[in-house]
Amino acid sequence: MPHIDNDVKLDFKDVLLRPKRSTLKSRSEVELTRSFSFRNSKQMYSGIPVIAANMDTVGTFEMARVLCKFSLFTAIHKHYSIHQWQEFASQNPDCLECLAASSGSGSADFEQLEQILEAIPQVKYICLDVANGYSEHFVEFVKDVRKRFPQHTIMAGNVVTGEMVEELILSGADIIKVGIGPGSVCTTRKKTGVGYPQLSAVMECADAAHGLKGHIISDGGCSCPGDVAKAFGAGADFVMLGGMLAGHSESGGELIERDGKKYKLFYGMSSEMAMKKYSGGVAEYRASEGKIVEVPFKGDVEHTIRDILGGIRSTCTYVGAAKLKELSRRTTFIRVTQQVNPIFSNSQ
């Protein structure tokens, strides 16, 4: 029988962080590096826990080279060949600890994943990515991958509720990707009516994961550095970005010139374009759940990274968190009806 959950669920746009007394004199005093020990792999992580999404327009080797310099992480998309992986690994050995090899749950994807991890043993992270992390098939797949790679750290998703976070962690995953439908080029909510407001999903899933000594990634829904800070404040251990990293020199996607202006194509991995590119088209039994956009060309991604990290540091100073680790403990969200003054909203 249908049921309505009357609890209010919130998104990033519905809240602001309340400022609090601080002893910090400067943003430069804020430490953004986090260290984690993972539940199932027993591996250690140290870095700034912002991840480039495993989309072919974002999770590129070019992106990984730059993000690695800032101690950020990249989930490399699954469409690189083993030869491309080997070439990148030989030229960029220092980056290999800051990236994950991605896979879907199909047998061909898994075979390629095995080849990559056997050829490049320095890669210690696996990103298992499906649109619907609630299927029994996916849970069994996570168990199989854990059995095959007992010492690799496994990211798995996507889900939005605590009980599924717990099931995936108990099945062998270390870090659960949280988010269904919040992405800038995702149309799942429009096509299916399924989803969950991202802020509430992160808070509830973080609580479930941390109770089992697991971790979560807030995946999708960030449109500005303030949203990234809110995700960390809500309890996310990592934040994954797609649209915010699209449109750069290091991003994938075709470069288009029109009327003297440059654009880069950015599209969801369930869009018609992605399915034509990798699957020969949209299967007759399914619908496209992603859109295609032309992002104004932004140049090198380094400037955007500095802007994001600067915003997070500033958040920490406003709430009195000397370390990113302390941000969630210093967070009080207030519900709002308006985020910003809209008078010059069309100006850069």
Curated annotation (Swiss-Prot):
Gene3D superfamilies, A to Z: Aldolase class I
Cellular component terms per the entry's GO annotation: GMP reductase complex
Residues bound to K(+): 181, 183, 186, 189
A Pfam entry, by short name: IMPDH
SUPFAM superfamilies tied to this protein: Inosine monophosphate dehydrogenase (IMPDH) (SSF51412)
GO molecular function terms attached to this record: GMP reductase activity; metal ion binding
Catalytic activity field: IMP + NH4(+) + NADP(+) = GMP + NADPH + 2 H(+)
Protein name: GMP reductase 2
Native organism: Mus musculus (Mouse)
Lineage, top ranks: Eukaryota, Metazoa, Chordata, Craniata, Vertebrata
Gene that encodes it: Gmpr2
